[in-house]
């Protein structure tokens, strides 16, 4: 009986080959997708961390209201300046006129230098370095013309007196005597003219008697070169 059981057991036992582990060819793709997603997230973070360029805001165009306001302000400033000038005394008006004239001359000189391509600021009287008689004549005419521009000022007579005195300091006694004689001659001529003008009644078409000096020829001298009259040598 026991032998029957053993033979039955032996006949029932079936040895089957072990099934090979199934290999999934798609296995691991989910991991790759996770890695790819993680890499994309890193790139997105880097893009977010990059500073974004901010565009400069466009300048607003001035509107009509602002333009009108600026024009009104400029008009008020002009009116205030006109009122200020109207309240000036005669002496202050003259000083203001000379100041504006000086500014205009400086502006004209600058424009002339730019037009002719002159870069050196040395010009006018500073450009002179006289050595000959003709050069001193030209220098004297230019200096006299420059000084005469301020003859309307109330301080001009005192200025001339101080200037002559300071110049004569550098002369000898004999040269100062010559200057004195020339000034006395000019003084005598001036007295005669002033008396003649005081006695002559003012009439239509009759001009005032004037004394011709070297200053009368300066403008022509400046325009046409060295064709200056000999009055300058006779006087000085």
Curated annotation (Swiss-Prot):
What's the main place this protein lives?
A: cytoplasm
Record field: compositional bias (Acidic residues):
28-46
Its GO CC terms are: eukaryotic 43S preinitiation complex; eukaryotic 48S preinitiation complex; eukaryotic translation initiation factor 3 complex
Give a yes or no for keyword Cytoplasm in this entry: yes
Going by the UniProt record, its keywords in alphabetical order are:
Coiled coil, Cytoplasm, Initiation factor, Protein biosynthesis
Which InterPro entries does the protein's record reference?
A: eIF3-like_dom_sf, eIF3j
User: Which Pfam family is one of those matched by this entry?
Assistant: eIF3_subunit
Q: How does it assemble?
A: Component of the eukaryotic translation initiation factor 3 (eIF-3) complex. The eIF-3 complex interacts with pix.
- Which family does the entry's similarity section mention? Belongs to the eIF-3 subunit J family.
Q: What is this protein called?
A: Eukaryotic translation initiation factor 3 subunit J
């Amino acid at each position: 009986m026991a032998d029957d059981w053993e033979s039955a057991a032996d006949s029932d036992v079936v040895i089957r080959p072990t099934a090979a582990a199934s290999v999934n060819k798609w296995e691991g793709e989910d991991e790759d997708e996770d890695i790819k997603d993680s890499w994309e997230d890193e790139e997105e973070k880097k893009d977010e961390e990059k500073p974004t360029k901010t565009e400069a805001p466009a300048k607003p165009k001035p509107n009509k209201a602002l333009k009108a306001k600026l024009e009104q302000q400029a008009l008020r400033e002009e009116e205030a300046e006109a009122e200020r000038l109207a309240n000036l005394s005669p002496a202050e008006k003259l000083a203001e006129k000379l100041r504006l004239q000086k500014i205009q001359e400086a502006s004209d000189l600058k424009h002339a230098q730019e037009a002719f391509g002159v870069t050196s600021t040395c010009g006018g009287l500073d450009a002179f370095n006289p050595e000959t008689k003709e050069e001193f004549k030209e220098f004297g005419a230019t200096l006299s013309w420059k000084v005469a521009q301020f003859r309307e000022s109330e301080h001009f007579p005192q200025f001339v007196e101080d200037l002559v005195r300071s110049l004569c300091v550098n002369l000898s006694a004999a040269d100062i005597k010559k200057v004195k004689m020339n000034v006395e001659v000019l003084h005598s001529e001036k007295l005669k003219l002033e008396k003649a003008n005081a006695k002559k009644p003012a009439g239509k078409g009759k001009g005032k008697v004037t004394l011709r000096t070297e200053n009368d020829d300066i403008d022509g001298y400046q325009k046409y070169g060295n064709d200056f009259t000999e009055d300058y040598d006779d006087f000085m």
